[in-house]
Swiss-Prot record:
Predominant subcellular localization, coarse grouping: cytoplasm
Official protein name in the record: Rubredoxin-2
Superkingdom: Bacteria
GO molecular function terms attached to this record: electron transfer activity; iron ion binding
GO cellular component: cytoplasm
GO biological process, one term: alkane catabolic process
Gene: alkG
Role, per record: Involved in the hydrocarbon hydroxylating system, which transfers electrons from NADH to rubredoxin reductase and then through rubredoxin to alkane 1 monooxygenase.
Residue stretches making up the Rubredoxin-like domain: 1-53, 121-172
Amino acid sequence: MAKYQCPDCEYIYDEVAGHPHEGFPPGTSWETIPEEWACPDCAVRDKADFVVIESGSASPASGAATPEVRTATTPPKAEASPQKSTGASTPSANNKAKAKAKAKPARAKSSKDSTGKETTFRKWICITCGHIYDEALGDETEGFAPGTLFEDIPDDWCCPDCGATKEDYVLHED
């Protein structure tokens, strides 16, 4: 079984682990993934852009740097990779810059819960594609009832539009 890496965000698809959230159970080979599939973290790169980083039982050459293995549930490194483009001309950099520009403290809606305490609802925006999660509305198609706070969503949840991780969401103001 092999591992394939997105050249933009360094997400790694591991055939052994699969990616159940994307519908690929453990053991799903790279060849069976549809050609139109895109990186679930950045949605910028298509399957054809991925590079093989580990194949079968082959091990990296001695003395060679071993790439960070990051799966759908592992957050990215904080520091930038020297091989990644950091210019604002890349599509993912443009998308993230636009979303971060909008990332201001959210004007909150509020309501009282069953105990009489005031609950403040906020909106969260995906920095990759701009999807907005509104706590007041929830997302019934994802199984989150109205009033479900973002912090109560499981950590392995991904953006329903682009597949980005929960860590790729920031507070949003209308």
